[in-house]
Amino acid sequence: MSTFDRIHLVVLDSVGIGAAPDANNFQNAGVPDGASDTLGHISKAVGLDVPNMAKLGLGNIPRPQALKTVAAESNPTGYATKLEEVSLGKDTMTGHWEIMGLNITEPFDTFWNGFPEEILTKIEEFSGRKVIREANKPYSGTAVIDDFGPRQMETGELIIYTSADPVLQIAAHEDIIPLEELYRICEYARSITLERPALLGRIIARPYVGEPGNFTRTSNRHDYAVSPFEDTVLNKLDQAGIDTYAVGKINDIFNGSGINHDMGHNKSNSHGIDTLIKTMGLTAFEKGFSFTNLVDFDALYGHRRDAFGYRDCLHEFDQRLPEILSAMRDNDLLLITADHGNDPTYAGTDHTREFIPLLAYSPSFKGSGVIPQGHFADISATIAENFGVERAMIGQSFLAELK
């Protein structure tokens, strides 16, 4: 059994690998998720060229149908499998929290028909700004600013919308509603959505810039989450004095709980990879865990149902993967996974209920191949066993498989 000095977990946000067994219990625009397959459909529809992930074993992961343009490796350099979600949700928080060992049996509240008048009125009274009622429904984040951004620029009204996720999002043009004001309004919205019937996973500030017809969301997004309801493996590590580094929106997702080094938000996937490599190179980071989220797959291409853009984003990550591998020390372990699906060829605009891939690599590996299929929380149990801390609620370690 290997024991690694450092483990680096990279979440490719929304890069699912085929419909989960219970996918038909979830839907997009009235269409059950049972036929969703993020990687499979991208590979089939627009082609997928990811030789570096293929070398680690991406094409070796068992599937009903092989990935069309990602061949299995006869001698992969890593271990591979797919993992199933048990929690009742397909949102970012649920996925990440389960990866860190929690089972979410009661999902957060979602608002398919928009938020109740009581919430909107409270936000209006607090902010002194009106809320655009027509935007108050599940909406694509880019479409909502295209549709209501011009009106906001004229009136200063707030754009409040939601999605299939348990989130309240406030979009604000940075020249009309300053960032400090937007963040203050979001903090208030967080304070009034902490219990049922409006228990939301996140309040998200969605600033943007530009002119009508050419709006662009900025990297000044900020998430206001709730802390996990029980200790995750992040907390177990932190309590044991083991370093935990967060790259990208990880700190927001866990509300800082169990994280003792926040490396900041990502401006892009490429910036996030730069930050990860910088983190891996820190001389003080001798032992511990880094946790990175790369969100562009989901935010820029999955929700927009842009299969070509999604494919290109995967290509860009794959091209930079050798840099990550080169930054590893001999006794490091790299885990690459996802948190849910977001099939860009599917109905609707929201996440899809899918298996997630898992690729594992270490310079110290003497073996490779496919390991048994498991569940999201197995990642956290493996991390816990490696560092000698107690696991969280659920999960079975696969550390013994990594040789």
Curated annotation (Swiss-Prot):
Cofactors required: Mn(2+)
Annotated Gene3D superfamilies: Alkaline Phosphatase, subunit A, Phosphopentomutase
InterPro entries from the UniProt entry: Alkaline_phosphatase_core_sf, DeoB, Metalloenzyme, Phosphopentomutase_DeoB_cap_sf
Known catalytic reactions: 2-deoxy-alpha-D-ribose 1-phosphate = 2-deoxy-D-ribose 5-phosphate; alpha-D-ribose 1-phosphate = D-ribose 5-phosphate
Pathway the protein contributes to: Carbohydrate degradation; 2-deoxy-D-ribose 1-phosphate degradation; D-glyceraldehyde 3-phosphate and acetaldehyde from 2-deoxy-alpha-D-ribose 1-phosphate: step 1/2
Positions bound to Mn(2+) 1: 13, 339-340
One of the GO biological process terms: 5-phosphoribose 1-diphosphate biosynthetic process
EC number, as in UniProt: 5.4.2.7
Subcellular location: Cytoplasm
Keywords from the UniProt entry: Cytoplasm, Isomerase, Manganese, Metal-binding
Cofactor annotation comment: Binds 2 manganese ions.
GO molecular function: magnesium ion binding; manganese ion binding; phosphopentomutase activity
Pfam families: Metalloenzyme
Residues that bind Mn(2+) 2: 298, 303, 351
Highest taxon of source: Bacteria
Function: Isomerase that catalyzes the conversion of deoxy-ribose 1-phosphate (dRib-1-P) and ribose 1-phosphate (Rib-1-P) to deoxy-ribose 5-phosphate (dRib-5-P) and ribose 5-phosphate (Rib-5-P), respectively.
HAMAP family, alphabetized: Phosphopentomut (MF_00740)
Name this polypeptide is given: Phosphopentomutase
